[in-house]
Curated annotation (Swiss-Prot):
Source superkingdom: Eukaryota
PROSITE patterns in alphabetical order: WD_REPEATS_1 (PS00678), WD_REPEATS_2 (PS50082), WD_REPEATS_REGION (PS50294)
Biological role: Guanine nucleotide-binding proteins (G proteins) are involved as a modulator or transducer in various transmembrane signaling systems. The beta and gamma chains are required for the GTPase activity, for replacement of GDP by GTP, and for G protein-effector interaction.
An annotated Gene Ontology molecular function: signaling receptor complex adaptor activity
The protein's name: Guanine nucleotide-binding protein subunit beta
Length: 375
């Protein structure tokens, strides 16, 4: 068979796949006679309401000299780790705004960070394609820096996201620009499983984000520049359990819903979407029209403890609080006093749900508390 014939067969197969996907999309739309907000309205549900003092900025964490790219809370709610383009990880006391650790990184181009479940270690990764682990209790070296306690090497592209397996300091999942996700054994520094890559059901572009289910830690979801999200079982690396379609741009962020049966996605197309992992169906789209201007990209997201609220960061500095049930914006933190002056790059909710932390390219982190005292 000639090269020309192979190319023709490949093009025909690609077109067939595209046609089948479109037919599947149309069939799903026929079966979905309503969405979450439509059903909620039919049941007489009313939107969540916010007063001017219900969610206020009570702390401003200043110390980074470069864009803040990532943050994470400890399970005990009073500490935050942040990663910045200044090449440092900073661990903050969220109650006092004091820095407890400042770790200078070998590679300044850090993109992600995470606290271990015990709060004793932090992980980070970036353009060096390595996920580095730092033990916060280890003695500092003669230059005043914390030494790396473990380097997880194996990715062939940048490390875009990392998350510890819930209740385990010994296992962690990373996503990468090499189109794969990896489950690591931190004790040995070895890869336990690789998800994607040479496998047909893997992503076909950079993987940007991962989220592990807290109710079933064997399951995690990944979001990619191929516009899809995929559900994985960490015991079955050879294939994704489901692939979720709907976005028209890179999927920048994914986050499990508190009950573990659904998850949210945020994309370059300016929308967030809610999917059900049991049916594979899209339940809701969260989108706020912005006129004829450029559509701001979704950069980060987090659900409230109950799941009724969805906090979403955008590239234009907005931070919307969505009512997930009625798909309504109930508050925009980008339009209140003490809002950020740049892109919202990351955000996260404390373990008890009492506070939200946002990080921005303006180099600051801000803690927003429900019913707190404004700074």
């Amino acid at each position: 068979m000639s090269v020309t014939e192979l190319k023709e067969r490949h093009m025909a197969a690609t077109q067939t796949v595209s046609d089948l996907r479109e037919k599947l999309k149309q069939k799903r739309l026929q079966l979905l006679d309503t969405d979450v907000s439509g059903y909620a309205r039919s049941q007489g549900k009313t939107p969540v309401t916010f007063g001017p003092t219900d969610l206020v900025c009570c702390r401003i964490l200043q110390g980074h000299t470069g864009k803040v790219y990532s943050l994470d809370w400890t399970p005990e709610k009073n500490r935050i780790v942040s990663a910045s383009q200044d090449g440092r990880l900073i661990v903050w006391n969220a109650l006092t705004s004091q820095k407890t650790h400042a770790i200078k990184l070998p590679c300044a181009w850090v993109m992600t960070c995470a606290f271990s479940p015990s709060g004793q270690s932090v992980a980070c990764g970036g353009l060096d394609s390595v996920c580095s682990i730092y033990n916060l209790n280890s003695p500092i070296d003669k230059d005043g820096n914390h030494p790396v306690s473990r380097m997880l090497s194996g990715h062939k592209g940048y490390v875009s996201s990392c998350q510890y397996v819930p209740d385990e300091d010994t296992h962690l999942i990373t996503s990468s620009g090499d189109q794969t996700c990896v489950l690591w054994d931190i004790t040995t520094g070895l890869r336990t499983s690789v998800f994607g890559g040479e496998f047909q059901s893997g992503h076909t572009a950079d993987v940007q984000s991962v989220s592990i289910s807290s109710s079933n830690p064997r399951l995690f979801v990944s979001g990619s520049c191929d516009t899809t999200a995929r559900l994985w079982d960490n015991r079955v690396a050879s294939r994704a359990q489901r692939t979720f379609y709907g976005h028209e741009g890179d999927v920048n962020t994914v986050k499990f819903f508190p009950d573990g049966n659904r998850f949210g996605t945020g994309s370059e197309d300016g929308t967030c979407r809610l999917f059900d992992i049991r049916t594979g169906h899209q339940l809701q789209v969260y989108y706020q029209p912005h006129g004829d201007g450029d559509i701001p990209h979704v950069t980060s997201m987090a659900f409230s403890i109950s799941g009724r609220l969805l906090f979403v960061g955008y590239s234009n500095g907005d931070c919307y609080v969505w009512d997930t049930l009625l798909a309504k914006v109930v508050l925009n933190l980008g339009g209140v006093q003490n809002s950020h002056e740049g892109r919202i790059s990351c955000l996260g909710l404390s373990a008890d749900g009492s506070a939200l932390c946002t990080g921005s390219w303006d180099t600051n982190l801000k803690i927003w508390a429900f019913g707190g005292t404004e700074v």
